[in-house]
Amino acid sequence: MSSGRIVQIIGAVIDVEFPRDSVPSIYDALKVQGAETTLEVQQQLGDGVVRTIAMGSTEGLKRGLDVNNTGAAISVPVGKATLGRIMDVLGNPIDEAGPIGEEERWGIHRPAPSFAEQAGGNDLLETGIKVIDLVCPFAKGGKVGLFGGAGVGKTVNMMELIRNIAIEHSGYSVFAGVGERTREGNDFYHEMKDSNVLDKVALVYGQMNEPPGNRLRVALTGLTMAEKFRDEGNDVLLFVDNIYRYTLAGTEVSALLGRMPSAVGYQPTLAEEMGVLQERITSTKQGSITSIQAVYVPADDLTDPSPATTFAHLDATVVLSRDIASLGIYPAVDPLDSTSRQLDPNVIGNEHYETARGVQYVLQRYKELKDIIAILGMDELSETDKQLVSRARKIQRFLSQPFFVAEVFTGSPGKYVSLKDTIAGFKGILNGDYDHLPEQAFYMVGGIDEAIEKAKKL
């Protein structure tokens, strides 16, 4: 085990000098003597100097301190011992419930499964959320992104998906909180505890207030734990909130590492960093990882390099829209912008496919007619267009749904709608079976039967 000393500190980036014959390898973990800090080697600058990122605060460090090379990458606890626990980026417990007591530790830098090992599947994953099951159905073992600007409901949607899938699903889940609010992490922990599923979830947090090194690596820590469960033959759920903060942490340290910034100030290695993470989130012949990732969209611009790079890796994209949220329709999913690889008649069947496309056609046509309505009013439309607009407004309202996790705010009990009921309801609206009901009846209800009941009271 070689040792060196600190020669330079700039924020989270620390240069360490080692004897030339024992320079640490890239990604080796170094320990600072007399401090709790772990450093990860990023570059070899020559002359025995390595440039590292601190996995923790650099307060109290100074030049000349001794640093020991552990000779291996950062490793974290894996396996059943992690279930029901909250850990940080290094796998240390932060829930004040004693040591993890793991039997095995894995390094967080691992190769992605080879092409021959990967397995694809077409099984649908029912979420109980109408708009998602209808327009952008999820695949078991697929990757899903929830895209949205600030305050349109990414985290609430994610929490509802966790409640509906993780609680109905009997396997293990891993939640990686990457650069998000501590309050949300706390809420999530209690939500899991109250639902009695905490013993099936491993939680890994690197909050907003953590240094960039933690936020850059915490996603890999969570992923490593999920990979262990997958390789044991389980179907695992991996939730990541938020992928954008992972990119942002890379941006924060990129300039300090001496790289030239690229478009919009992002790191030049943006696509590679995203690929390293996303290529490991995959299903193999042993087991599957189904991942649901929240993606913050800066300034509501989906063409920003960060969300644009994420799009390429996903099987389904759920786009949350500020315009829909402003109408009071929650979940604010845009049914015209959201897509899924599963939306194929050979996978989901003709009835589902035609209903989904029918809903999209009606909403698209309504969008086109809005300008005419704004200028000339409804009276100038043809009878068929008037009927279409009326159905579109019903569909728009029927796409809303009360959530279990938002009961405290809305005061109305949450609803889980099966895929069969979802298809039947929208098919009925498209066929004109409910043309006689007022559009208010379709707002914030579960299945179509509730809308019929609600109409009787209006």
From Swiss-Prot:
Q: Which GO terms describe its cellular component?
A: plasma membrane; proton-transporting ATP synthase complex
* InterPro entries given in the database record: AAA+_ATPase, ATP-synt_VA_C, ATP_synth_F1_bsu, ATPase_a/bsu_AS, ATPase_alpha/beta_chains, ATPase_F1/V1/A1_a/bsu_N, ATPase_F1/V1/A1_a/bsu_N_sf, ATPase_F1/V1/A1_a/bsu_nucl-bd
Q: Which organism is it from?
A: Pseudomonas fluorescens (strain ATCC BAA-477 / NRRL B-23932 / Pf-5)
Against HAMAP family, the record matches this protein to: ATP_synth_beta_bact
Among SMART domains, the record links this protein to: AAA
Q: Tell me the protein's name.
A: ATP synthase subunit beta
Which Pfam families does the entry link to? ATP-synt_ab, ATP-synt_ab_N, ATP-synt_VA_C
**NCBIfam families tied to this protein:** atpD
EC code: 7.1.2.2
**Encoding gene (name):** atpD
For this UniProt entry, what is the primary localization, expressed as one broad class? Answer: membrane
The residues that the entry says bind ATP are: 148-155
